[in-house]
Amino acid sequence: MTMAAGPSSQEPEGLLIVKLEEDCAWSHEVPPPEPEPSPEASHLRFRRFRFQDAPGPREALSRLQELCRGWLRPEMRTKEQILELLVLEQFLTILPQEIQSRVQELRPESGEEAVTLVERMQKELGKLRQQVTNQGRGAEVLLEEPLPLETAGESPSFKLEPMETERSPGPRLQELLDPSPQRDSQAVKERALSAPWLSLFPPEGNVEDKDMTGTQLPESLEDMAMYISQEWDHQDPSKRALSRYMVQDSYENSGTLESSIPSQEVSSTHVEQGEKLWDSSVQTCKEGMNPRNPVPGVEKFENQERNVESVSPESTHPPVLLPGQARREVPWSPEQGRLDDREGHWECPPEDKIEESLVGTPSCKGLVQAKEQPKKLHLCALCGKNFSNNSNLIRHQRIHAAEKLCMDVECGEVFGGHPHFLSLHRTHIGEEAHKCLECGKCFSQNTHLTRHQRTHTGEKPFQCNACGKSFSCNSNLNRHQRTHTGEKPYKCPECGEIFAHSSNLLRHQRIHTGERPYRCSECGKSFSRSSHLVIHERTHEKERLDPFPECGQGMNDSAPFLTNHRVEKKLFECSTCGKSFRQGMHLTRHQRTHTGEKPYKCILCGENFSHRSNLIRHQRIHTGEKPYTCHECGDSFSHSSNRIRHLRTHTGERPYKCSECGESFSRSSRLTSHQRTHTG
């Protein structure tokens, strides 16, 4: 024994070392891996992450990337699925507050699933406004939605005898309504604890004063509502979400339990009561209002109450209480009323909110819709006409103002306050309000007078930026600038020819229509252009004044005729060479031959021209445009003179005749060549 103890005592450290190695081996065992967080957990951490949770910005960004990848799972999902998650999150964010939290607790996985849940909850909230009270046993029990299936399976059964209705209940509701003698009232309480809609009602009284246990059923509906609300708040969120989902799922198939409540006695009693039904309904609507703050809608109910006696018993309906009237006649949601802190009463909302809250009430709905005409509070002091808003009244009063200013006494026509109508009114009464002090000419508008006065002052405030030329009117400047830009905004719809000015287009269209609006009063001959008419009228004037009585000298056909014989020379004379012209524009064009001015420049090649027509003819070289088409053979030409020369080949016209031998030619150049044969 001693020898065995010797070595054991001599090697205590070895034993310790063996024990340490054994402990070390235990410590080196790989710990079990932590479970990977779910996508929802990563999503919540991603949204709740704060900058202060990380030691630095780089770590914060890295943590956010990690949480985002844990939420979206790009290695498992496609781009479309990730986009669906982002859209789903934004959709859940913009939902109304009353259903947002409920949908988020159900955690829909796709947008379609979220839309389905929202639609079901909207139907649920709509049905809550159509609750019916069950007065069969003396206590008003509000039954709105079917109960969850889990509670029905775990608790004893209870028996309900469904009343015959037009629609049959769904399979889940039929299972609950299956007659079984083993169900008691305890199952009713257990099912009621999971109904989500009961938590929407505002609790009343002090919950702490009520000492109730899970086995004690409240005696009144008020105690039941407070007890259910308290238990619902302490319930597990997962069970609460599951209960809501089951309620919504069965709600769509079954409708509401109000159609399955044994209410034959109640309905028969209501039919026997007759007129009293409507009286109670109207009284119920009145009691929902605060007498301290009367609203305009009260008169609607009072007026309808007087006409109740004419309603037949067949058209009556069971009395319906508003949600919350079973609990001291209090509105059930903040949208229908708010609590007055001073006296502890719920104030009645405005009239429009009351009408919205009465949508599900058949008896009150007809009363509300009886008088829905908009009120007209804006009265015209002149004619007494009434309007619903102030803007319509102001628009109407402008008619009276226009009648005062613009009533035409002679023709009885009324014009508005627009300057165009005022000027039109002046033409009716012959008024010329604006008179020129220089020549005495009158104008109906001040702008016309200002434009006319520039002819006396010579003012030309509108200057061309390209060539520096000035004009008295802005319209003339715009017309002039087209010579530089080459713009031709006016196009003939018949042949497609384009023009720089609208007047040229109108003149051209007369070729297609054959219109000749200018007619000579002497002989009745018509012309397509006013200039042609002026030239023609000079022939009649020359016949009356030829020969002149003062000098006895006649005028040949080639000399221009002067309507004013006081000046026997042309009105516009060139100061350089003495040549005279009948029009100022011809003199201006002639003076460019002396000055060498070429204001018209080609924007493509830079070549300058003294006349605009030469520039237009030149630009067709660059564009290749041939706007003049022969109607006989379809050939096109860049110049009108070429088309005229070409048309003579079809018509055989020879306008150029030799005075020596009488031979005719189609071109002037050929006549000139022929005349050289006579002169040698």
Curated annotation (Swiss-Prot):
Gene Ontology CC: one annotated term: nucleus
Chain positions of cross-link Glycyl lysine isopeptide (Lys-Gly) (interchain with G-Cter in SUMO2): 19, 159, 286, 300, 376, 570, 579
InterPro entries in the record: KRAB, KRAB_dom_sf, SCAN_dom, SCAN_sf, Znf_C2H2_sf, Znf_C2H2_type
GO BP, one annotated term: negative regulation of transcription by RNA polymerase II
Region (Disordered): 147-191
PTMs per UniProt: Ubiquitinated, leading to proteasomal degradation.
UniProt cross-references to Pfam families, sorted A to Z: KRAB, SCAN, zf-C2H2, zf-H2C2_2
CDD domains for this protein: KRAB_A-box, SCAN
Keywords, sorted A to Z: DNA-binding, Isopeptide bond, Metal-binding, Nucleus, Phosphoprotein, Repeat, Transcription, Transcription regulation, Ubl conjugation, Zinc, Zinc-finger
A GO term, aspect molecular function: zinc ion binding
Subunit: Interacts with a number of proteins involved in chromatin modification and transcriptional corepression including DNMT1, DNMT3A, HDAC2, PHF8, TRIM28/KAP1, SETDB1, EZH2, UHRF1, CBX3/HP1-gamma, and CBX5/HP1-alpha; recruits these proteins to the SIX3 promoter region, leading to SIX3 transcriptional repression. Interacts with MAPK3/ERK1 and MAPK1/ERK2.
Family per similarity comment: Belongs to the krueppel C2H2-type zinc-finger protein family.
Protein's name according to its UniProt entry: Zinc finger protein 263
